[in-house]
Design a protein with these regions (language model features):
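Conserved interaction-surface patches within small, structured recognition/assembly domains
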Residues: 122-124
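Accessory alpha-helical DNA-binding modules that contact the DNA backbone or grooves
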Residues: 106-120, 132-159
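Structure-specific DNA junction-binding interface
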Residues: 1-103
Length: 159
């Protein structure tokens, strides 16, 4: 008997977007000679992707599409610099909406680390957080953790 990597012999290998549950639409573009393409971020992993759309009726910028969907072609990754101008303008609002839609997952980042050095290091990974701010965040967090972004903002003085 040969060892396996957790997949049956006749199972297809898992794709990079198989665990994604939603797409949040950043932009809709017309494609030549026909059809449309949407640029999106995936949820929960926040990949930037694009997909051909069979029917743009009901597809709106900023709204989420549940996956899997028969109306979409395959997903392919897009670099941030390759997004259309309108999609780049929409990305901050879409990321905020995705975070708000799954608060527990994202607040968990602040509460995940157990010992002091891991908490300190995790906070230092955030953009704009230096040593003194990371120490302040660790002390403000305490053992109980936070339950909302408002608590984090208030305790740590983050804008």
């Amino acid at each position: 008997m040969q060892p396996t990597d957790g997949q049956e012999a006749d199972e297809e290998p898992k794709g990079p977007y198989d665990d994604e549950t939603h797409l949040r639409v950043l932009g809709i573009q017309e494609r030549r000679p026909m059809g449309h393409e949407i640029q999106c971020i995936t949820e929960p992993s926040l990949y930037i992707v694009r997909s051909r759309v069979n029917d743009v009726n009901g597809v709106e910028i900023g709204k989420a599409i549940t996956l899997p969907s028969d109306h979409l072609g395959p997903l392919s990754e897009v670099r941030l610099k390759d997004l259309s101008g309108s999609a780049q303008q929409e990305i901050v609002a879409a990321l905020s909406a995705s975070v708000i839609a799954d608060l527990d997952r994202h607040i968990g980042f602040y509460n995940r680390a157990n010992n002091l050095s891991l908490k300190f290091h995790a906070f230092q990974l955030l953009p704009g957080i230096g040593n003194s701010k990371a120490i302040q965040m660790v002390q403000a967090r305490g053992l109980a953790g936070w339950s909302s972004f408002e608590e984090i903002d208030e305790a740590c003085g983050i804008d």
